[in-house]
Amino acid sequence: KDLDFDIKVPGNYYKEVIEASYPALIEEEGTDYLVYGFLTKENQDTKYYLTLLILISALFHMDSSKIKNQINQEIDPDDFTARVGYGVRNAIILQAQKADAKKLDRYVEIIEDGFKEACQGINKESLKAAFSIFEYGQREQLISVMRGLTYFLMWQFDKPVFESFKIIDYLDELRDLIDTDYYENFIKENFIDNPTKLVYFAKPSSTYIANKQKDLDNYIAKLNENMTDESLTTIKENLKKLEIHQNKADTEEEKATIPVLNIKDVPVNVETTPREVIEDKFTYIYHDIDTAGLIYISLYFDIGHLNLDELRYLTLINDFMGSVDTESIPYTKIDDVLFQYLTSPNFSNSFINVNNEKIARLEKVSFTSTIDTAQKGLDLMADFMFNSKFDNQKRILELLRMKKSYFESGMYDQGHILAMNRANSHIDKATMIKDELGGIGSYLFLKDAINEARSDFDSFVGKIEAIYKKIFTNNLEINITASPTDFKQVKEFINGKFDNLASKQGEVEIGFTPRSYKEAILSNANVNYISKTANIEEFGKEFDGKLIVATSILSNPYLYELIRAKGGAYGAGITANRSGLLSTYSYRDPNILKTIDSFDSI
């Protein structure tokens, strides 16, 4: 039988601005969300979709973007983002986060004027850089273990199944179109002359959740008023059936319907990754693995000479490098150049438990390139490492507010992880450092840093510059994955580029005293993320692989049934790691005390 899978999406054009609210603890001025959106065309193909992604990157993501820079300067949001909304018919969503709704008209004007200017002649260097990001991504896709799933997810419903396998051909075609008017015409047809449009803003409301609860209570009260004895009896019977179902053990017949792997189908040997340690000017760890011509470079600098407060500021410096002016290039030009020579540039911290006593503290500098562009890519990364300028207060505040916005946007999706790390930070030194530099502790520090950069910029910059000069020393190890020929060349590039690094200063001990601690952190969410943790070493126990099996069983079915099936949380479980930390968690949980009782029942 033929089935009709066609799903129609109405092409609405909203002439009036749509106003809404969002939950907030405090109703502050300048914390509104501004949105400009429109739908893409119907029945789009892969070429159309790839063009959208390239243009989104070139027009809105690059630091050279005129639209982005004007919005940051005039609208002054905490963050400005552009994304494709997925569905049967995609949407382009442009959002200014934590801005003033009084500037909404100007926000719309900047976007629409930017479209008109771009369709007259888009910045070709931004276009080349955006395109280069996709080319690197496709090379990585060729060697990814997830490539099958990725190709499947790229398939658009009701389109040819093998359409996504033609992506390289489409990219070749789109590259050749950069120096034509294809992209300008695309902007005019799909952005400017688009028959759909939505302009929206949301203001903070401290009564949002209370009002929603009141609406729900009124709805339930109305249901109860109209409830018949017969309907009430049916509901009670269904609840009883649900309780019986939840508490009933599965029969052997029911268990047999669950797909399982036979134990003999599970490999018992771990595939060995090729690894060679080479002592040269620096220590190199080399992996001879097929990379489809890509070169993966990670430099690890020992930063054991930095204290905890300096490490906190280092997390800010990591966001500044590559996003502020250097001695040779303004930040508004960096992206246009950078992504033509490399992809995935990253400055970050890494902390490794060497043993129970020692934690290696490392600064990681990494990027991906090819042999044709690796030397230029290394030059650019070194420029960020040694020649960055931190004297632009407005730009520094933009980056700090963006960092805060990113954390706030993602905190509810990873609330259970933040809760576990925060709980463990009171009993484990490594997790304490992790929390202070990437968890709740880092968020609290970030808010203080924004105030410091705003009220006493000279003092703030003084700290940043002093720490910046101490980061990169000759205590360096390099991890490279590439072909043997490419590795040999890149090793020479690195030896030459980092020939004059300073010697590392003495090691600084970071103090820590474990303590039992109960803590509650208030958020705008109307659900909870709960964690209770312990270190098994305090009970004279050591980590054992059997503990992983035990936590798996305790997570599902035990905690799953108590906290999710019966308690209404989105998720719950317990984890264990090699440091001996046992961590329970619940995710988007409507309860608190009931969940803690469930943890205690273990």
Tell where the protein language model's regions lie, with residue ranges.
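C-terminal regions of mature proteins
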Residues: 130-288, 417-511, 518-520
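Generic marker of residues within folded, mature protein domains
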Residues: 26, 84-86, 192, 287-289, ...
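M16 family metallopeptidases and their MPP-like homologs
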Residues: 30-42, 67-119, 123-176, 195-205, ...
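His/Glu-based metal-binding/catalytic segments typifying zinc-dependent metallopeptidases
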Residues: 2-64, 139, 147-160, 224-322, ...
